[in-house]
């Protein structure tokens, strides 16, 4: 699902809201999450999950084509940890349809 599909689904479930207003709300929520992460804050949506940032130190990498060692700069990356309710719902909804590993 892409953002425009999310906006459309929310607008369909809330006919009293214009789709443009829903789009503005979704954009505002996403902007606030990104701004909080940029400040180094953690964003927790109880039951859904938590967004945070992780700092990856500089390291020596390798060019897979040539095998040459290349320096990789330190970077900050977004991280998402699912909430308990989401994990439970995903596991409950998948039920017996979940793929199993073939260890025979």
From Swiss-Prot:
Keywords: DNA recombination, DNA-binding, Transcription, Transcription regulation, Translation regulation. Signal peptide: none annotated. Pfam families: Bac_DNA_binding. Disulfide bonds: none annotated. GO terms for biological process: DNA recombination; regulation of DNA-templated transcription; regulation of translation. PROSITE patterns: HISTONE_LIKE. Residues 83-104 are annotated as: Disordered. GO terms for molecular function: DNA binding; structural constituent of chromatin. SUPFAM superfamilies: IHF-like DNA-binding proteins. Residues 83-95 have a biased composition (Basic and acidic residues). InterPro entries: Hist_DNA-bd, Histone-like_DNA-bd_CS, IHF-like_DNA-bd_dom_sf, IHF_beta. GO terms for cellular component: chromosome; cytosol. Belongs to the bacterial histone-like protein family. This protein is one of the two subunits of integration host factor, a specific DNA-binding protein that functions in genetic recombination as well as in transcriptional and translational control. Heterodimer of an alpha and a beta chain. NCBIfam families: hip (TIGR00988), PRK00199.1 (NF001222). PANTHER family: DNA-BINDING PROTEIN HU, INTEGRATION HOST FACTOR SUBUNIT BETA. This is Integration host factor subunit beta. It comes from Rhodopseudomonas palustris (strain TIE-1). The gene is ihfB.
